[in-house]
Structure formats: C-alpha cells, structure tokens
Amino acid sequence: MTNQAEEKRILIMAGGTGGHVFPALAVAKYLSQQGWKVRWLGTAERMEARLVPQHGFDIDFIDIKGVRGNGLMRKLAAPFKIIRSVMQARAVIKKFKPHVVMGMGGFASGPGGVAAKLSGIPLVLHEQNAIPGMTNRLLSRIASEVLCAFDGTFTDIKAETVGNPIRKELIALGEKRKPVCDDDSLKVLVVGGSLGAKIFNDVMPSVLEGVSKTHSMTVWHQVGRDNLATVKAEYQRLGQDGSVSVAEFIDDMEAAYRWADVVVCRSGALTVSELAAVGLPSLLVPYPHAVDDHQTKNAKVLVNAGAAFLLPQPIVDTSKLMTKLSMLASDKQELCNMGQRARDVAILDATQRVANVCIRLAEKG
C-alpha cells in the first residue's frame, strides 16, 4: 500500500443490476490491489447497497430514480430531483476528493457524472451493452474518456473498445477448459436470472423429453425465485427428473460453466462477455422488453462470430429448441468449434484496460 500522500482515489458509480455492478467490482478490486482507495456512489434501494459493502468497499447514497415511463407529475418534478442529487454527489466528491470518477451505469451515474464535470474531476464512462443507455449517451458529451465493451456501440463520438471486465476466475476457467467433443451426454445449462425466465421454465421440460428420445442429454436448470416446485414437478411428470438438476439459484457460476457443453440463456452484456471468456456455445433468447432491445444487439456479437444461435422469444417453442439442441448433440465437433469462436471474440484483459485508463487520467492530474 502506498502512503496517504501518494494514494490515488476513485469514485465508482454502478448500480441497479448485476450487469453494471459486477464489472465495476472487477475494476475496483484491481485498483484496490494497486493501492488505490475506492469508494462507491449509488442508491440505497438498489442491489449495490447490499453487494458493494459485501465486497469490502464503502458506499455513499444519493436520492435518484429513473425517469423513463413515469407519470407526468414525476417527470415535471424530475429536474428538481436531479439538481438535488447532483448537489448530493458534489458533496461526496468534495469530501472524498477522488482523482478520477468512473460511471458504469445505474441511476447514480447521471448526477455523479455531472457532479464530476462541475468539480473538474476526470470522468470515465464504460458502457457494457452494445447499445448505450440513455445516461451514458448524455454523459458521453462531457466525459474525459468513453469506453465500451463492443465495437460500434457509440457511432457519433470517439470511444475505445475495451471489453467487459469479468471475474478473473472465469478468465482462468476459459484458459483451461476443454470442450467435450466425444459422444458423452450433451450437458445443457439453462440460466434464467434471479427471477427465472418463464419461457425457459415453460418449454425446457418438454425439450428434454423430446431430445432424450434420440440423444443423451442432461440439464442443469436455474429456474428463479419461487419457481422450483412447479418446474421440478413438470420434469417429473414427463419422466425426466433423473436427467435434470433444478435450482432456484446457482451460486457458483464458475462450476456451472465448467460443467456445461452449451448454455441456454438471455443475452445481457455480462452474460455474453462471460460466455466468450469461458468459450461456451450458446442459444441466446434476448429479453424482449429490454430498453432499446439492447439484448438482441448484444447477442449478435456471438451470433455473428458463429459462436451462438439467436432465438427471438416470440418464435421460441419446444420444437425450435429441440431442433437446435438435437443438432448440437449429434455434432459435437461443431459444438467445439462454436466454443472456440466464442473464445476468439473475448477481450480477456478488459479489467486492466479500464483500470489503465483511470490510472493514466489520475497521473495526468
């Protein structure tokens, strides 16, 4: 650890979803190991309030909520609330005196980014999705550096493609993972997120029943909160309970990725980057209600590389999934090829790239 006079400080703004928080935590841990003091800016009602302290970082809260889709009165009041939240963020900056402020998405990023600009502190933005969110689109005009995970995210400003920071354990897994290209049972990991994906919960029991008539297939199905009993009962009704493991949550995604031959999942930015780093083929069903349909654009990063299949939710049914999984079960070499193509598009040093931009700006003063 450097002494107090030399210690660099960064204020990180990332919240609301794991897709914002976890990449930011990867950068925070890296910089902390380099002797930096890290502090967080977030909102008390969102997941960062719980996750960030669990990982050993202090967090300050400001009062801010999203404005998309709100009623007229809330929209009229929004400018006054934003001004208040900017003032709150400026107070945090004045007290903490960061050398750099980094925004990675979430409600606090907007006021925090404006406060950084008003305070004369370098502002780094990182956009995880292939289509930038509204806050990052606005802040990109005043940021010192704009970073993105995927090529072509920002079309009207200069942005550096650096990838999405992910946990170093997953990068290590990708380096040593050997895809199964023999005649073993096809191992299918189904991930629906914390609440589960209803489409997966509805069709996967029938998919397993259908594919198992001609190929050996086992499933590890993450069904989400309060869905365990219903989905498990459907697998049992179809006589497939011996070929499936059903869980509300999967705490150890490293173990799940290590086990799987192919993944059926949504296409959030972090998921896409993890699949690439680990080198896993996938069937991607973008969440149809994502803002600006950004999950479809995320998915195309892997689809265009030949590492994944894109299945828009309106066309997903038992037959579609059966066809794709049966094809992969009968052609393990293509499964291996898809995994290698996924690995080929991965940016494995994203954490260091983002951190190095912060370090460079701090050294410039």
UniProtKB/Swiss-Prot annotation:
Catalytically driven reaction(s): di-trans,octa-cis-undecaprenyl diphospho-N-acetyl-alpha-D-muramoyl-L-alanyl-D-glutamyl-meso-2,6-diaminopimeloyl-D-alanyl-D-alanine + UDP-N-acetyl-alpha-D-glucosamine = di-trans,octa-cis-undecaprenyl diphospho-[N-acetyl-alpha-D-glucosaminyl-(1->4)]-N-acetyl-alpha-D-muramoyl-L-alanyl-D-glutamyl-meso-2,6-diaminopimeloyl-D-alanyl-D-alanine + UDP + H(+)
The answer, when asked if Magnesium is one of the entry's keywords, is no
Q: Membrane topology for this entry?
A: Peripheral membrane protein
Q: In which pathway does it act?
A: Cell wall biogenesis; peptidoglycan biosynthesis
Check the UniProt entry and state the signal peptide residues, or none: none
Q: Where in the cell is it found?
A: Cell inner membrane
* Swiss-Prot/TrEMBL keywords: Cell cycle, Cell division, Cell inner membrane, Cell membrane, Cell shape, Cell wall biogenesis/degradation, Glycosyltransferase, Membrane, Peptidoglycan synthesis, Transferase
Listed binding positions for UDP-N-acetyl-alpha-D-glucosamine are: 17-19, 129, 167, 194, 250, 269-274, 295
Query: Which example biological process does GO assign this protein?
Result: lipid glycosylation
Taken from the record, one Pfam family name reads Glyco_tran_28_C
Q: Which function does this protein serve?
A: Cell wall formation. Catalyzes the transfer of a GlcNAc subunit on undecaprenyl-pyrophosphoryl-MurNAc-pentapeptide (lipid intermediate I) to form undecaprenyl-pyrophosphoryl-MurNAc-(pentapeptide)GlcNAc (lipid intermediate II).
The record's comment on protein family reads: Belongs to the glycosyltransferase 28 family. MurG subfamily.
Q: Please identify the protein, giving its name as recorded.
A: UDP-N-acetylglucosamine--N-acetylmuramyl-(pentapeptide) pyrophosphoryl-undecaprenol N-acetylglucosamine transferase
The species this protein belongs to is Shewanella halifaxensis (strain HAW-EB4)
